[in-house]
Amino acid sequence: MRKNALLLALLAAGPLFGPYTVAAQTPTADQAPLTLTQITQMAFQVSPTLTAAQQSVVQAQARVGQAQAQRRFQITFNSTASLSGANVYQPPPTYETFGTLQNTLTVPLPLGKRPRLAITQAQELRGAVSAQLDSARLALAGQAAAAYYDVLRKQALLAVAQQTLIENQRALSDVQKRNGAGDAAQLDVLQAQVPVAAAQAALGGAENDLAIANETLNSLLGRPLDSSLLLADIAPNALALPYTLSQAKQFVLERSPDLRSAEATIRADRAAVDAARLYREPAYFLQAIDIRSKDVTSFRSEDTLQAAVTLPLSDGGLGKAQVQEAEATLAGASAQAEVVRRTIISGVSAAYLTAQSRRRQVDSARTARDIAQVTYDKTTLGYRNGLFPLFQVLTARAALTQARIAYTQAVYDAAAASTTLSTAFAGSMPTPAPAPAVPAPAPLAGTIGTSPAGTGPSRASSGGRGGP
């Protein structure tokens, strides 16, 4: 039993005697904590992915302008100068050399359905690209939120590790004093040294985890990887879900940019099919021709106004092949839209259930932490009164440490899950204000005061947070 208790003590954290707290770092006036909204806006400003998506929208708009230009009158001027030699039927002269200048104005007439279908196709593709830009924004917002909450989570866990080490060192010192006074055995001193060593190892891991999380967030913001950030912490309560699962599915189908992009692509491909089927549509031109010649046997100048019609008679099967290609593209776009629809439904369902589960986990973890605190307090009092051996105190402390870590994880997991659900809702889900943190009850006699990390995080910075 003592062996098991020693193994559990490797994760033990929490004080043995006397009140002790570590205050959270207070930001200075010129270092206002950055909120998630501010972090997201900063990511938007420097993201190359978002810049590329924005340029795609500009390109799509330019293609719309090109298609619309095909519906306007376009005038082409052509001038041809030539030098000719000819035998004359009725001399004199029997042979002559003369020059000719021909000026031609050609005006294609924007008649038929194909120019209008080209405009429709370009406009729908512009809508698809615009929806893809919205999707890129949401994806980037999701990445920013994940990195933001990961930094907060790692800061909170680092604070737990720091406080754990301090409290275990304090506990070891107290046991050593009791051993010197003859109130504790030497084995108790050895047992108290185990959680100190474990806490030192855990602190190194927590510092490394926070450094990696900071680098990830800084990379997303285009900042130096080792720069520090001061982040505004969250309330220790998950956000309420304002919709049922069925309502969530319906809402996301109406607002999803990925589905809007897929549907716009279908409409564009349908216009392309209609245009391809008009491969025999004639083309109309209007021409004004002015000819000036030095031919003495013919006219000196000639002005002509003519209308021309170009009608494809045979293209070797090119038109039919283009129709088949357009129809296959349309069928593929329709299938892809169904894939997107199913992915969206499954994604929002998973996000909704996860957010709901995370919220319940926060409540359960809070209850478990409170019970572990009471158990530890009573075990500590029993140890001080000689009723329990030290290994039972270490076991209770290990359970309390695990409960604190689980609660800290649950708080940030719930916040991240709510943000993920909001992203699945195309960022438009109404979000009720979080409930304020409930103050923790006063600590029992002989226990430490409850710090912010013990009741739920309230503020975080790159320099650390309050202890557990």
Name each model feature, range by range.
Residues Q41-T51, V58-Q74, N103-Q121, S130-L138, ...:
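A glycine-/polar-enriched beta->alpha junction
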Residues R2-L8, A136-F251, A351-T354, R358, ...:
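Periplasmic alpha-helical coiled-coil/stalk elements that build and connect Gram-negative outer-membrane
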Residues A198-R223, T367-G427:
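Short segments within alpha-helical structural elements
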Residues T26-A32, T76-R114, A118, L230-L245, ...:
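Small/polar, glycine/serine/threonine/aspartate-rich low-complexity segments that form flexible
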Residues L239, L245-A288:
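Acidic, glycine-rich loop-and-beta core segments that form the ion-binding/anion-interacting portion
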Residues M1-Q45, E207-F251, T420-P468:
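Terminal intrinsically disordered/low-complexity segments used for targeting and assembly
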Residues A185, I344, A351, G386-P389:
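Alpha-helical heptad-repeat coiled-coil segments that mediate oligomerization/polymerization in large
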Residues T120-Q123, Q186-P195, L390-A398:
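Short, charged, amphipathic alpha-helical segments
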